[in-house]
Amino acid sequence: MKNSYINDNFIVSPLWTQAVDPQKEKKEKVVKILKIILKFTKLFIYAFLFLMGLWGCFQTMVDPTVKTSTTIGSGMEFGFPFGSTGDFRYDLTSGANNEYYAFTSTQWNISDYGPFFGLFVYPGAMLVLSIMYPLRDVWGGLDALLGIFVLLFIIRLITFLISIRSTMQSERMSEIQGKLAEINAKYKDVKKDMAMRQKKQLETQELYKKYNIKPFAMFEQMFVTMPIFLIVYRVVTILRPIKVINLFNIWALSASPLSEITSNLSNGGWVFIFFLLIIVPSQIISQKIPQILAKRRNANARALSQKGNDSAKKMRISQTVVMVVLVFVVVQSPASVGLYWFLSSLFTIAQSVIIHHYIVKRKTKGVSLEEKLRELGIK
């Protein structure tokens, strides 16, 4: 008598003999290729932006043809060709005996002032100029305010996904601090043991892989932020119509706050003290808000490793150094740069709040951030 019954019509194939779905295999190959293409595309874009930022920075320092001046009709200016509108605020013309370099609205090329001005500064300056001219007679320089606001809005819209990715990476890093602390405690006294150090490094890498953490992704925003700052800086300092504006009939956008306070204090320069009291705190707040919101989101994940504490400390120091440098630049630059800085800080605060509520909402609903990032193509 047989111990088992086998149905001839039912055949079970071992796993190793099961046929592979060719469509699935093809799809996986396509996805893999697309990921590689996306990776190298992002690498190329970031490298290009970084190099263009360096190009613009060095060109600003050494090229006399792109230097700016607070005096109208002097230095490099962007506007319409002479005689186009009949309005001296918009038509480019030099002052008497001034070194002058006209960058007109018809010069969309890289042969005159290089790729940084041709590819990046020109589109931004043209956008602001196109907004300001139809509104040229509005009160208090609101045309300049609107022009810079729209430029920043478009830039922030383009870079929003990068900001989300950077924030998500920081979020995940905060969430695994407890596990990192456990790994560091486990290998606390292995500084001279190369094998154990390698094992510790391997466990850390496995943890990063599990939570899809890419340490360098948190610095992506920096590669984009600095070139953008330089681009908008050049836009607001070379636009001729901005140089003639008194914002709210109080602050001359072509004037340097530091120069006005130190050399013209009793003759109206004192108003720039209030200008700085608005500009500088707004930027400090915009830097603190993301940190405060991150602490609220991760109130239960406070167990930081020593390495985590050191990294957080270094991050705070570097942010402080950058802040001090930017304050120095803004204080001695034309007030138009301060106006841009103020609007930028408002965008940063709004962006931080939006991302915060998005993350909290996802956590409340129990939706995996990983899944949503895949849907958005951010991961």
From Swiss-Prot:
Cellular component GO terms held in the UniProt record: plasma membrane
Keywords carried by this UniProt record: Cell membrane, Chaperone, Membrane, Protein transport, Transmembrane, Transmembrane helix, Transport
Underlying gene: yidC
GO molecular function: membrane insertase activity
InterPro entries xrefs: YidC/ALB3/OXA1/COX18, YidC/Oxa/ALB_C, YidC_ALB_C
Designated name of the protein: Membrane protein insertase YidC
Biological process per Gene Ontology, one example term: protein transport
Family indicated by similarity: Belongs to the OXA1/ALB3/YidC family. Type 1 subfamily.
Species annotation: Malacoplasma penetrans (strain HF-2)
Protein origin, superkingdom: Bacteria
Topology of the protein relative to the lipid bilayer: Multi-pass membrane protein
TM region positions: 36-56, 115-135, 144-164, 213-233, 235-255, 265-285, 322-342
Subcellular location(s) per record: Cell membrane
PANTHER family, A to Z: CYTOCHROME C OXIDASE ASSEMBLY PROTEIN COX18, MITOCHONDRIAL (PTHR12428:SF65), OXA1 (PTHR12428)
Complex formation: Interacts with the Sec translocase complex via SecD. Specifically interacts with transmembrane segments of nascent integral membrane proteins during membrane integration.
Pfam families the record matches: 60KD_IMP
Job description of the protein: Required for the insertion and/or proper folding and/or complex formation of integral membrane proteins into the membrane. Involved in integration of membrane proteins that insert both dependently and independently of the Sec translocase complex, as well as at least some lipoproteins. Aids folding of multispanning membrane proteins.
